Amino acid sequence: MAVKRAPSKKVRAEQARRPKKNPLIAAGIETVDYKDVNLLRTFISDRGKIRSRRVTGLTPQQQRQVAVAVKNAREMALLPFTSR
């Protein structure tokens, strides 16, 4: 009688490596603006840190735009530096 086995580690690893959906492309946004605070909050952790590309699924260019926009929004007091 054949025993059903769980998928091998290699198969599970391939399934786990699916790229994340790019939230900026999904929303149709080409450039990130520091005044769009609701959008920027999606890229900030609950501790106030900018989330990494691996977490957000952004391209390198978009990640740089988001980082600059978040820093500008912090300087303009639209976003807090920390979240207490």
From Swiss-Prot:
Biased composition (Basic residues): 1-10
Presence of the UniProt keyword Zinc in the record: no
Single Gene Ontology BP annotation: translation
Keyword annotations: Ribonucleoprotein, Ribosomal protein, RNA-binding, rRNA-binding
Renumbered residue ranges of the record's region Disordered: 1-20
Domain of life of the source: Bacteria
Family (UniProt): Belongs to the bacterial ribosomal protein bS18 family.
The name this protein goes by in its record: Small ribosomal subunit protein bS18B
